[in-house]
Amino acid sequence: MIVYMVKGGKYYRVEESVRLDAITPRGLYVNLTNRCDNDCVFCLRRTKEMAEESSLWLEREPSVEEVIEEFRAAPWHLINEVVFCGFGEPTLRLQELLELLRWLKHRHPTIPTRVNTNGLGELAHGREIAADFDGLLDTASISLNASTAERYFQLTRSSYGVGAYEAMLIFAEHMKKFVPNVVLTIVDKVNPPEEIERCREICRARHLQLRVRPFET
């Protein structure tokens, strides 16, 4: 699926989501790629079983035009946020992501936008990219995952090695200058309480917000 909606941990095609509930506002999720530069041990790519009709695995990466076609058909009276989040890392398709954010801000300026990211976009592109999101993005949700570089690498198996951890934190600080809401996340069942508290301390020291998110199955 290129675009989808979520309820109770299940992914639905937009038309099916609306058929089941034509009243409640919800997010519209955008799936741009299967590619990811991390290989997290807890990733849904490994653990979640999905029917073919509701799978997030893409046969190919959609073009900007194909995503916009999906946007044009979306039930905007029900949408309260647009979230770029799939089985891959959205910032690996940075130019397409930015073009779609520009389209959304022009056509639906009151709808908040969010990108769920591993925070390694500056490593992937070899430059600072935070300023690219200025005026386009309302929330950046960045996966913190751990309180140390070593534990981070054990969990994420990042293609960039242990240095990915500090790069992710620096990216979060860069994003604070251009994006109103920057949130770092960790997964509850993956981390014991003392590790979660250490992550809180790291976020406090860098003036960043932490969200503990539930493990999805």
Residue ranges of model-derived segments:
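Short, histidine-centered active-site or binding-site loop motifs used for metal coordination
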Residues: 47-49, 83-88, 156
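Conserved beta-strand positions in the central sheet of alpha/beta enzyme cores
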Residues: 29, 44, 83, 141, ...
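Short, conserved beta-strand segments within well-ordered enzyme catalytic domains
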Residues: 29-31, 81-85, 114
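A generic local structural motif
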Residues: 14-17, 69-71, 126-130
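Catalytic phosphate/metal-binding cores of nucleic-acid and nucleotide-processing enzymes, i.e., regions
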Residues: 21-22, 54-60, 64, 81, ...
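N-terminal [4Fe-4S]-dependent radical SAM core
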Residues: 1-34, 41-59, 76-78
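Short Fe-S-cluster ligation motifs
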Residues: 64-87
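Conserved AdoMet/S-adenosylmethionine-binding subsite of the radical SAM
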Residues: 90-217
